[in-house]
Design a protein with these regions (language model features):
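N-terminal, polar/charged subdomain of small-to-medium soluble alpha/beta proteins
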Residues: 1-86
């Protein structure tokens, strides 16, 4: 999957499954390209999610919910994901 399509898919899935005020998805793969663990076709993403719904959960519960929503993408296209919830 191409990174821009992945970003759009991630954003749409989060917005479909969680009540959000704002979702920003950033490609941070360029920061990791020289790492020995870098795999072509696997991306490093940063998610910034403004959600009163997720803010009601503790950090672990909110992160688990995002991981459940993005299960297929994490298994197939995402090497690393940073999640910031506000």
């Amino acid at each position: 999957m191409e990174v821009n399509k992945l970003i759009l898919t991630v954003k749409e899935k989060i917005e479909k499954n969680v009540i959000t005020q704002n979702v920003i998805v950033k490609d941070k793969t360029y920061l990791h390209k020289k790492h020995s663990s870098h795999q072509p076709g696997k991306f490093h993403l940063e998610l910034i999610i403004k959600s009163e719904e997720l803010s009601k959960y503790n950090k672990i519960q909110a992160t688990k919910k995002i991981y459940e929503i993005l299960d297929d993408e994490i298994k197939n296209y995402i090497h690393s994901i940073q999640i910031l919830i506000g």
